[in-house]
């Protein structure tokens, strides 16, 4: 039985998805978002979203009331599939793509002079650390491929953990990684790819929280995991707060009664980590600020 509250949430979700698809469409067509075609596009996307959502509602996927044991064998399979699919693009674009943003960061790695024009945390984690093992852009891109595959492995295991059938997980994985745009973009070592990795981790953690009705969050070790992933996602892009901020807001809003102190702890730890990294840590490694930043 669908309650009035759920109907409003359903409508809100459809409106948000419609607006998202409408705005995204202009990134591909490079046309002006407020052109004469705007009403037609909105109506078209609205109909598409409504039909798709109603069709998906008819699919019954059983979610366990309690999580099952972790299936590491299945996780290894997901990891292997991800590595193979991404590996095809890695070989095709060897030694990996690089754009002007990444080239600037790679130059900072070689000189040891860091400027917060692009997120320094991304420069350090995804370029500097791998370069200490092998100072090669090809190796840096390979390590990034490993991180992507591990993140997808974690998400797949969480979905299986809560009763999603293996075939649905594999289908979702194949749909995500066989799209050429995904494979090509993930072949570039840049901040958008790094953000994607941590968004995948956050998505898995949100599944844990929602499916457990907040119980997953009621452990301080999980608070640390969620806060850390949120910090990393935010620091991969200068506008990362636009993603993490609303996520934490809704986390507190929906789970305040069931996990009040853990919600507060997550937000406070998140703030402390951000201040600590962008304050004392940046000063320690002499990060130079910039009057303008690239989001």
PLM regions and their residue ranges:
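Start-transfer (signal-anchor) and selected internal transmembrane alpha helices
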Residues: 1-24, 31-86
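Extracytoplasmic catalytic/substrate-binding loops of multi-pass membrane glycan-assembly enzymes
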Residues: 93-105, 113-126, 134-138
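Juxtamembrane membrane-water interface segments immediately following transmembrane helices
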Residues: 242, 263-295
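Specific aromatic-rich, kink-prone transmembrane helix
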Residues: 110, 154, 196-214, 230, ...
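Transmembrane-helix motifs of polytopic, lipid-linked glycan transferases
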Residues: 47, 142-163, 201
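Membrane-interface alpha helices of multi-pass inner-membrane proteins
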Residues: 222-237, 248, 270-274
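Transmembrane-helix signature of polytopic, membrane-embedded enzymes
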Residues: 10, 155-180, 197
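Aromatic- and kink-enriched transmembrane "portal" helix at the membrane-lumen/periplasm boundary
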Residues: 27-35, 91, 120, 134-137, ...
């Amino acid at each position: 039985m669908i309650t009035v509250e759920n109907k409003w949430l359903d409508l809100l979700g459809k409106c948000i998805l419609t607006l998202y698809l409408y705005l995204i469409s202009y990134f591909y067509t490079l046309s002006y978002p407020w052109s004469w075609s705007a009403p037609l596009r909105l109506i078209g996307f609205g109909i598409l979203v409504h039909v798709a959502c109603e069709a998906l509602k008819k699919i019954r996927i059983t979610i366990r009331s309690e999580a099952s044991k972790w299936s590491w064998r299945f996780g290894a399979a997901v990891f292997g599939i991800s590595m193979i699919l991404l590996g095809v693009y890695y070989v095709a674009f060897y030694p990996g793509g690089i754009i002007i943003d990444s080239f600037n960061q790679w130059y900072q790695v070689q000189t040891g002079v860091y400027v917060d024009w692009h997120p320094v945390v991304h420069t350090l984690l995804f370029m500097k650390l791998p370069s200490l093992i092998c100072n090669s852009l090809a190796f840096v891109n390979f390590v990034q491929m490993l991180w992507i595959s591990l993140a997808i492995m974690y998400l797949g295991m969480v979905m299986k953990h809560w009763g999603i059938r293996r075939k649905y997980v594999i289908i979702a994985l194949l749909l995500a990684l066989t799209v050429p745009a995904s494979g090509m973009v993930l072949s570039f070592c840049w901040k958008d790819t790094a953000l994607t990795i941590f968004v995948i981790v956050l998505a898995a953690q949100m599944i844990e929280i929602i499916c457990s009705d907040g119980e997953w969050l009621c452990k301080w070790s999980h608070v640390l995991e969620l806060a850390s992933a949120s910090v990393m996602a935010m620091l991969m892009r200068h506008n990362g707060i636009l993603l993490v901020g609303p996520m934490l807001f809704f986390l507190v809003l929906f789970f305040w009664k069931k996990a009040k102190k853990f919600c507060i702890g997550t937000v406070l730890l998140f703030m402390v980590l951000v201040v600590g990294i962008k304050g004392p840590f940046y000063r320690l490694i002499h990060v130079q600020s910039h009057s303008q930043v690239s989001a």
